[in-house]
Each structure stands twice: as C-alpha cells, then as structure tokens.
Swiss-Prot record:
Listed name of the protein: Large ribosomal subunit protein uL14
Entries under InterPro entries matching the protein: Ribosomal_uL14 (IPR000218), Ribosomal_uL14_bac-type (IPR005745), Ribosomal_uL14_CS (IPR019972), Ribosomal_uL14_sf (IPR036853)
Pfam families: Ribosomal_L14
An example molecular function term from Gene Ontology annotations: structural constituent of ribosome
Entries under SMART domains matching the protein: Ribosomal_L14 (SM01374)
Annotated source species: Kineococcus radiotolerans (strain ATCC BAA-149 / DSM 14245 / SRS30216)
Amino acid sequence: MIQQESRLKVADNTGAKEILCIRVLGGSGRRYAGIGDVIVATVKDAIPGGNVKKGDVVKAVIVRTKKERRRADGSYIRFDENAAVILRADGDPRGTRIFGPVGRELREKKFMRIISLAPEVL
C-alpha cells in the first residue's frame, strides 16, 4: 500500500536507487496504490552515469509491496520491501533488466514486458 511521500526501492537498472511517490494515478482522490498501479515519483537517490538522475520526475509501476494483498483464490502475497520499475511514456520499462521477483498482478494489468524481464513471477 503506497501513498504520497512513500519511498520505494527501484527494481531495474536505470541508475535510480530510490524514488519518492508524489502522486497515485487513477482518479482524483485516489489515496493508495498496490501492485500493478502506476505512480508519479521523483528520484531521490541515483548512481552516477545512469539513465535518470536525482530530481527527475518519472512514472513508475509498483512491483512489490510490504502490505499483503488478497488474491481471488483466497491466498495472500506480500514481499519484504516496497519496489517499483520506472516506465517510459509508452508504458514499457525504461531499464533493460528487472531485479527480484514481481507480483502476478502485473500480468492482469498488461505489463507483459516487465513480466518477461523479471527473474521470477509470484
């Protein structure tokens, strides 16, 4: 469950290490975002020579959350950290690699490029 001012780890190789959520997209009063939701964020920490730099405003999709999420079959999924993947304007990931597992909810939200790059889909 991600809201404004939440900090997330970046799970790709764009050069950003940490981002801060500044808006949850999808409705005027939307407060929380979960796995598969798109947010607007700013880069808070980045490595030198990366594709993005500190202060850049980016769109990102959430791939892991600490807050458990109930699935249709009654099971729950949760991760050890909050993480996101930075997106281009067309919705594809900006990086070429994804680190760590991602939630199956991304498949239902049509983020197939992220699913194919991820080492594990839970």
